[in-house]
Every structure is written in structure tokens, then in C-alpha cells.
């Protein structure tokens, strides 16, 4: 009935029972071999070597997934390790799942490609090959480069505005406040830069037209500059109209990376008319936008503090107190108003609790 094969090198670790005899598995002196199922009469029988490989694979996957001592199905066992989907599997297996040699190198970084790029390809944004998990040491240039790629993808490349700046970087902690406080001068500077760059790019853009005009009319050499000068004001106006929304888009792209800082918040419940000072909240740097909410202890409704101020000393107005005579309740390293809230003292969740969030993307 069964094809001739070599004896199985490893007997089945689980003893055969009468209940399991009719479940599609036949146990004998030469080892275990699966029977063909009734609904698949032409199913090919597994050879001894194939069964041994699948059984070892099943044992390995049982150890990796830390399953119980139950018998593992030896028909097939596989785990999909994909950096786009199964991040949890990668975390359990370790960081060795993503090897540096498996990543494809960009065509610009190859040692043999030393030829200068054509002007058509010079304005293309850098390609991001695939999404790699952030915990892996193999990342595409880090978090800042991913923001650069996202910002460069939105900028047009065929003369529809100013090209992407070469030195794009992530904003410093103080730049978010500056960008939010003074958005108009940056847009005007962007318009001026776009106007200057458009003026520099216009001669090569008009070169094909002028060459075609010179080839069609070899005697007339003066009209092309006149036409170019006539088209300058409209092109400049159009470039201004195009550059202003692009500058706002780039500002929005930069503002996506928001640094957080701790501030002092006064909490107030309007429904219960209860007010208390609960010390530390996380705000976007330079603003009063709060990312941490609390619930009222009476009505349990969510609300935000109606007033947020910097964590500074009341007398010297500094983050680190520099007063000659310090009050007893003020910590020299953390000069907050620590005497206002007395209910959270010696509790697990108190006003002194801080959170590990540093930035929000």
C-alpha cells in the first residue's frame, strides 16, 4: 500500500493510543507515516526525508513560539517575517532578522556609477526602497532622512516651483516656536528665493525655444530675447502664486515633527466648578497645546487645563532656581509649585510623575 522507503530515523515522541489511531496517522514499528485523507484520494505520500525535515521545522517553530507541550502538526510550519507587517515576530526573534547585506543599494551609491547624472535626473528626490522597522539597526538614514524624503516628494521637479533645498534638516527645539510665531516672513523669504531661482532657471528653460526659433529663422536673432523679456512678468507672478502654497506646505511638513516640553497646568472642571493645580503637562514647545488630559475626580469627564505656564521659579523666573534664599518646599533641581497639590502625596500616580514621551510625529 505504501511505497518502499528507508526506516524513519526518529520514532514519534508521543505513544500511540487507540483514540488517535483513526485520526489519519498510522503508527508502526518503522516510525509514523501519514495516511492519505479520505477527501484527497490522489494525495502524494510524504517521504521519510521530507517528513523528517517538516518535523524538525515544526519542532523549531514550537520552540520559537514557546508553545505548550502539545503535539505540533508536522504537515507544514512557517512564519512570515516581513518588515512591513510582522514587527512583533521580529521583536521576538531579535534584531538578526534584518541583515545589512540584504538591503538593496541605491544606484547612486554604487562604486561603478561615477558618471555625472543628466539634468533631467538631477532634480529627482531620493528613493526610499522599503519600509524598515525603526527598532532595526538597518534603517534608511534614520528618522530625519525619512522626513526629508517625505518633504521632497511633495516638491515638483519639472519647473513648477522652487526645487527642494539641499540642506533639509529636522527643526531644532526652538524653531517650532519661531515658525509658529512668525510664519509670514518665512513665506516672503521663500517667495524671494523662489523668484531668484526661477530667474536663474528661466534661461535654460527658454533655450529650446530660442534654438528652435534660430533654426527656423536664421536671419532674425533679436526677437527671442524680446519675447523672453515679455514673458518674464507673467512667469514671475505665476512662480509667486506657485511658491506661496509650496512654502506653506513645507511649513506644515516641518510642523509635523513637534517637540514636547513640560509645563505647569491649572486644571478646572466647569461642570463641578472644581479647580486644582496638578503640576506637569506635556505641551508643544512654544505653544499651550496640551497632549495630556485628566479626568475630574467627581464627574469623570475629560477636560484640558485652561491655563498653562512654564515651569520656572516664581522669584527668579528661571528653570533652575538661582535665588540666594530658597524656600523649603522648592526643589533646587525642579523648582515647581510643589506645595499646591497635597492629595497626591505618597501615591503611585502623583504630580511628580513624568512621562517618557519626547516627541510626537
From Swiss-Prot:
Subcellular compartments: Cytoplasm, Cytoplasmic ribonucleoprotein granule; Cytoplasm
Region of interest: Disordered: 68-129, 142-252
Single biological process term from Gene Ontology: membraneless organelle assembly
InterPro entries linked to this entry: Zar1 (IPR026775), ZAR1/RTP1-5-like_Znf-3CxxC (IPR027377)
Basic and acidic residues: compositionally biased ranges: 238-252
GO cellular component, one term: cytoplasm
Record keywords, A-Z: Cytoplasm, Developmental protein, Differentiation, Metal-binding, Oogenesis, Phosphoprotein, RNA-binding, Ubl conjugation, Zinc, Zinc-finger
Residues in 3CxxC-type zinc fingers: 263-346
Amino acid composition bias (Low complexity), ranges on this chain: 116-128
MF-aspect GO terms: molecular condensate scaffold activity; mRNA 3'-UTR binding; RNA sequestering activity; zinc ion binding
Phosphothreonine carried by residues: 155
Post-translational modification, as annotated: Phosphorylation by CDK1 does not regulate formation of MARDO (mitochondria-associated ribonucleoprotein domain) membraneless compartment.
Superkingdom to which the source organism belongs: Eukaryota
Pfam families per record: Zn_ribbon_3CxxC (PF13695)
Assembly and oligomerization: Interacts with YBX2.
Summary of the function given for this chain in its UniProt record: mRNA-binding protein that mediates formation of MARDO (mitochondria-associated ribonucleoprotein domain), a membraneless compartment that stores maternal mRNAs in oocytes. MARDO assembly around mitochondria is directed by an increase in mitochondrial membrane potential during oocyte growth. Promotes formation of MARDO phase-separated membraneless compartment by undergoing liquid-liquid phase separation upon binding to maternal mRNAs. Binds to the 3'-UTR of maternal mRNAs. Maternal mRNAs stored in the MARDO are translationally repressed.
Assigned protein family: Belongs to the ZAR1 family.
Domain text: Disordered region at the N-terminus undergoes liquid-liquid phase separation (LLPS) for the formation of MARDO (mitochondria-associated ribonucleoprotein domain), a membraneless compartment that stores maternal mRNAs in oocytes.
Listed name of the protein: Zygote arrest protein 1
Species per Swiss-Prot/TrEMBL record: Rattus norvegicus (Rat)
Higher taxonomy: Eukaryota, Metazoa, Chordata, Craniata, Vertebrata
Primary gene name: Zar1
Amino acid at each position: 500500500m505504501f511505497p518502499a522507503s528507508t526506516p524513519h530515523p526518529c520514532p514519534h515522541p508521543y505513544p500511540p493510543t487507540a483514540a488517535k489511531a483513526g485520526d489519519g496517522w498510522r503508527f508502526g514499528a518503522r516510525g509514523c507515516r501519514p495516511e492519505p485523507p479520505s477527501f484527497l484520494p490522489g494525495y502524494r505520500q510524504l517521504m521519510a526525508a521530507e517528513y523528517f525535515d517538516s518535523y524538525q521545522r515544526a519542532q523549531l517553530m514550537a520552540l520559537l513560539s514557546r508553545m505548550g507541550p502539545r503535539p505540533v502538526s508536522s504537515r507544514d510550519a512557517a512564519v512570515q517575517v516581513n518588515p512591513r507587517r510582522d514587527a512583533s515576530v521580529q521583536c521576538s526573534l531579535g534584531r538578526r532578522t534584518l541583515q545589512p547585506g540584504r538591503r538593496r543599494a541605491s544606484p547612486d551609491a554604487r562604486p561603478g556609477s561615477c558618471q555625472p547624472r543628466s539634468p533631467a535626473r538631477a532634480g529627482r528626490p531620493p528613493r526610499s526602497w522599503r519600509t524598515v522597522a525603526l527598532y532595526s539597526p538597518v534603517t534608511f538614514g534614520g528618522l530625519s532622512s525619512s522626513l526629508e524624503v517625505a518633504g521632497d516628494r511633495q516638491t515638483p521637479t519639472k519647473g513648477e516651483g522652487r526645487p527642494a533645498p539641499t540642506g533639509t534638516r529636522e527643526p531644532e527645539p526652538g524653531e517650532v516656536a519661531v515658525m509658529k510665531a512668525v510664519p509670514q516672513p518665512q513665506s516672503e523669504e521663500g517667495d524671494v528665493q523662489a523668484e531668484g531661482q526661477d530667474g536663474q532657471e528661466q534661461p535654460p528653460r527658454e533655450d529650446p525655444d530660442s534654438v528652435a526659433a534660430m533654426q527656423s529663422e536664421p536671419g532674425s536673432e533679436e526677437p527671442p530675447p524680446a519675447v523672453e523679456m515679455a514673458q518674464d512678468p507673467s512667469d514671475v507672478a505665476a512662480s509667486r502664486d506657485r511658491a506661496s502654497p509650496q512654502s506653506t506646505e513645507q511649513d506644515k511638513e516641518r510642523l509635523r515633527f513637534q517637540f514636547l516640553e513640560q509645563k505647569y497646568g491649572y486644571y478646572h472642571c466647569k461642570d463641578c466648578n472644581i479647580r486644582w493645580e496638578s503640576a506637569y503637562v506635556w505641551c508643544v514647545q512654544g505653544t499651550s497645546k496640551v497632549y495630556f488630559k485628566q479626568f475630574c475626580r467627581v464627574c469623570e469627564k475629560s477636560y484640558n487645563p485652561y491655563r498653562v505656564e512654564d515651569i520656572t521659579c516664581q522669584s527668579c523666573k528661571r528653570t533652575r532656581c538661582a535665588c540666594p534664599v530658597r524656600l523649603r518646599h522648592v526643589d533646587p533641581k525642579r523648582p515647581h509649585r510643589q506645595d499646591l497639590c497635597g492629595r497626591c502625596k505618597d501615591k503611585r500616580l502623583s504630580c511628580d510623575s513624568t512621562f517618557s514621551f519626547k516627541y510626537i510625529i
